[in-house]
């Protein structure tokens, strides 16, 4: 169910224990509630015309506890604040290049002009993990990320099974041609949100997850 995404950003989760209706109502508006229960994880490719990667096999059922997940990708503005509070470790968290949505000016990290509400990109896994801890949250597991993206009806894309277009997802855009216009603000493209209301689960930037992948 993957659509090509560029670079690395992050979203975060909070896990709930003993979830109740009151807990569902008492969290920030910028997070969405993902209920407990099973979902079908993975995607089986039966021919070359289908979406997906071979490493998405085998299809299997996973049961998750309830959790909250960020509705939006982390912005360049918010990540710059984190870096400024951890400047000694910042080089381990991100490498500032002309293709990154933040810059380092006069001893301070800041979002590039006009990109304040765009997703942070080119973040290392260590930077993503440290930022989540700084916020009192954590990275989602791959299973948590996929359920938040696809829901429980085995859809191919966050919005359903319809072919991707640029009203739903940053589709077939190249940084070499478009520069930062390859991305969109984190709260844009509402037609492409997931069943739970999470934005840009199939576009903008890649997101890190907590667990690691063994191709062997």
Regions from the PLM with identified roles:
Residues 9-11:
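Generic short amphipathic/hydrophobic targeting helices enriched at N-termini
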Residues 17-18:
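C-terminal motif of bacterial Sec signal peptides marking the signal peptidase cleavage site
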Residues 26-99, 122-126, 202-203:
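A short glycine-rich, aromatic-capped structural motif
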Residues 34, 40-50, 103-216:
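Functional-site microenvironments in short loops/helix caps that host divalent-cation chemistry
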């Amino acid at each position: 169910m993957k659509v090509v995404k560029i670079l690395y950003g992050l979203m975060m989760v909070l896990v709930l224990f003993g979830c109740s209706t009151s807990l569902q109502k008492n969290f920030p508006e910028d997070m969405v509630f993902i209920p407990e229960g099973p979902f079908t994880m993975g995607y089986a490719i039966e021919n070359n015309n289908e979406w997906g990667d071979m490493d998405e096999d085998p299809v299997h059922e996973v049961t998750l506890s309830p959790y909250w997940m960020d509705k939006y990708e982390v912005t360049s503005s918010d990540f710059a604040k984190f870096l400024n509070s951890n400047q000694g470790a910042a080089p381990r968290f991100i490498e500032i290049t002309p293709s990154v949505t933040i810059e380092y000016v006069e001893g301070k990290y800041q979002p590039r002009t006009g990109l304040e509400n765009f997703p942070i990109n080119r973040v290392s896994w260590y930077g993503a993990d440290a930022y989540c801890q700084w916020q009192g949250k954590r990275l989602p597991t791959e299973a948590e990320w996929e359920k938040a993206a696809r829901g429980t009806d085995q859809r191919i894309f966050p919005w359903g099974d319809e072919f991707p277009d640029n009203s739903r997802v940053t589709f077939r855009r190249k940084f070499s041609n478009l520069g930062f216009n390859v991305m969109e603000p984190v709260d844009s493209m509402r037609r492409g949100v997931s069943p739970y209301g999470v934005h840009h689960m199939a576009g903008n930037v890649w997101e890190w997850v907590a667990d690691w992948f063994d191709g062997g």
